[in-house]
Amino acid sequence: MRPSSPSKDHYTQVPIKVQHRAAKRKRIRRKRVDLNCGCSYYVHINCHNHGFTHRGTHHCSSGDEWRLYLGGTKSPLFQDHSTRQQTVRNEPGHNNRPDTVQPQPEESVGTTSMLDGFQGLDDLTASDLAFLEGI
């Protein structure tokens, strides 16, 4: 006969397949957002603090992020309407090149400057070279 009160001694765990089946039936909590360009996207309840860029426009899904991207008088952060100076100037030394590929130094042929100080490297025996390769 089964006890009337649940006890940890008499508890059987629900099989994982049953848990997965129940989780699949659960409705996905998400919100549909329509954009000005005619596109729409869905925001999952757990992803509400992430933004993205679509067709050159940054879209935000959180109130904190909207505060940073609001412009003009709507912005709670920038209520001062005076003329602002540019914070990052295009001066020599700043990386303001249009291409994002950074040039790599050319590989040189010969000994490196690190080995220039060692004299007598030609005098190493085969056992010395085997030891150094094993390190």
Swiss-Prot record:
One of its GO terms (biological process) is symbiont-mediated suppression of host innate immune response. It holds the Pfam family Gemini_AL2. Keywords: Activator, DNA-binding, Host cytoplasm, Host nucleus, Host-virus interaction, Inhibition of host innate immune response by virus, Metal-binding, Phosphoprotein, Suppressor of RNA silencing, Viral immunoevasion, Zinc, Zinc-finger. Residues 98-114 have a biased composition (Polar residues). InterPro entries: Gemini_AL2. Signal peptide: none annotated. Its main location: host cell. GO terms for molecular function: DNA binding; structural molecule activity; zinc ion binding. This is Transcriptional activator protein. The lineage of its organism: Viruses, Monodnaviria, Shotokuvirae, Cressdnaviricota, Repensiviricetes.
